[in-house]
Amino acid sequence: MKVTNIRTLVVNAEMRNWVFCKVETDQPGLFGWGEGSLEWKTRAVVGVIEDLAPMVIGEDPRRIEHIYEKLYRQSFWRLGVIGMSGISAIEQALWDIKGKLLGVPVYELLGGQVRDKVRMYTHLGGGDMRSVYETFEVGPLIDLALKVIGNGYTAIKVVFVPYSEPLEGIGKVKRFATLMGKLREAVGDAVDVMIDFHGRTYPAMAIQYILAVQEFFPYFCEEPVPPENVEALLEVRQSVRVPIATGERLVGRHQFRPIFEQRACHVIQPDLCHCGGIMEAKKIAAMAETYQMGVAPHNPLGPVANAVALAFALSTPNFLIQEDMLTDVPWRWDVVRSSLKTENGYWLPTQVPGLGIEVDEEQARKHPFKQEVMHSTTIRAKDGAVLDW
């Protein structure tokens, strides 16, 4: 059996373009799908998949680890987030092929189920771009949060951390604490609330913001500082009593290693569409388990990524909770028919072989590539300096 072709399919979903990767074989009707969606880098990911494809064509698709090693090590230049997103998409598709070939869901190939169902959380608006990133007032915040809870979720993530300079006055801190307090009052103690800092703050302000909301018990505070500085992250973790999460912008187990060695967080968040794929994420999770850290994978991406996330979550012992954005666009399930089922804030296992999805390429082509809305280019300090989005 050999890989005969690799091609990409780009689907614009407003907030981001989904980059689907199809790996075809010489066996009639046997192919697999993966996803490497990366905001504002769509054409680069498509290009890197095209560049990597010759290293895979002609290989036996069942030799997944061998192909990964070839792509990662024989490219000579170590791959960053663009290259690793390309590898991730190809690697996922190989698992889809192998599951179909053996007639089992991918999670059965990863050691089988360690849990009966997978807890989910979503964002304001269920992933609607403007609700997620443009809700900074109490009224809309409460309305959108209650709608999410009404849809069965028991956990929600919010992104209302102020855009911040290295130091800010008391006004932003008080406003942030008020929002979290009103949200906790509205949803009650039975709902977990995660706060995504989006890497917007330096340690001094991150610590002040977190201390201001500790009494409302966030489930975790995510990426309180930009991802480049492990020591800064450790400073935050040691200064607060709220669990700290990070990792969505790290790729490969080697970038996670300093986080583990310095115990710089409590929860890691690899993105299976960027970190190197399913097996690399399993290795990262195993490292985290050694350090008694939980795993809450990053996944605001497309429907292929959802299927990948389900397989990972069902088979990973230290998994905590799974991010989703299932209502980002109304036609999501027209493009990808999925065996994914939800119930009371949980994903349920599928018995469909492979990843359990079918991509409708005709429907997908109704939503061709468009340049994504670039929120980040408008974020400025009072003096006009650029801030982290």
Locate each region found by the language model:
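Metal-dependent enolase-superfamily TIM-barrel catalytic cores that perform enediolate-based chemistry
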Residues: 117-239
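Glycine-rich, aromatic-flanked loop segments that form ligand/cofactor-binding clefts
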Residues: 91-131
